[in-house]
């Protein structure tokens, strides 16, 4: 977790990201789901027994940079997250998280929805 905080403190919006490379299939990922709008894949540093990301194929650096016309796309990410959670057997529940900016723990500046499950989640999360 400390490693992710350190990454978030130095990460900045702009430029190509690892997620862009995954979308273009330049680097491998354990893909769970793909359609014309988004991609879901397992996190390389899981924070729960099941931890995957859902990302839009359209580049949006962070939620605060989203436009009104991104509303449907952002909602689609949540629906895909729900469907993937069901497909992965997360019947007892799961958590969906979007990190925003350095204080929010955002380490990659390409909007992404974390879906975590497979254990009891703690509250408060941070």
Curated annotation (Swiss-Prot):
GO biological process, one term: regulation of DNA-templated transcription
Position of sequence motif Histidine triad motif: 110-114
Binding of AMP, residues: 43-44, 99, 105-107, 112-114
GO cellular component: cytoplasm; histone deacetylase complex; nucleus
Domain HIT: 18-126
Cellular localisation: Cytoplasm; Nucleus
Record keywords, A-Z: Acetylation, Apoptosis, Cytoplasm, Hydrolase, Nucleotide-binding, Nucleus, Phosphoprotein, Protease, Thiol protease, Transcription, Transcription regulation, Ubl conjugation pathway
Phosphoserine PTM positions: 45, 72
Catalytic residue positions: 112
Name of protein: Adenosine 5'-monophosphoramidase HINT1
Lineage of the organism: Eukaryota, Metazoa, Chordata, Craniata, Vertebrata
Gene name of the encoded protein: HINT1
């Amino acid at each position: 977790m400390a490693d992710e905080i350190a990454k978030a403190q130095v990460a900045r919006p702009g430029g190509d990201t690892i997620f862009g490379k995954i979308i273009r299939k330049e680097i491998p990922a354990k893909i769970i789901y793909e359609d014309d709008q988004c991609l879901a894949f397992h996190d390389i540093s899981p924070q729960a027994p099941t931890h995957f990301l859902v990302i839009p194929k359209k580049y949006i650096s962070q939620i605060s940079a989203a436009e009104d016309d991104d509303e449907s796309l952002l909602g689609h990410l949540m629906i895909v997250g729900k469907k993937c959670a069901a497909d992965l057997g997360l019947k007892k529940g799961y958590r969906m998280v979007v990190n925003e900016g350095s204080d929010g723990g955002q380490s990659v500046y390409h909007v992404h929805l974390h879906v975590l499950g497979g254990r009891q989640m703690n509250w408060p999360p941070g």
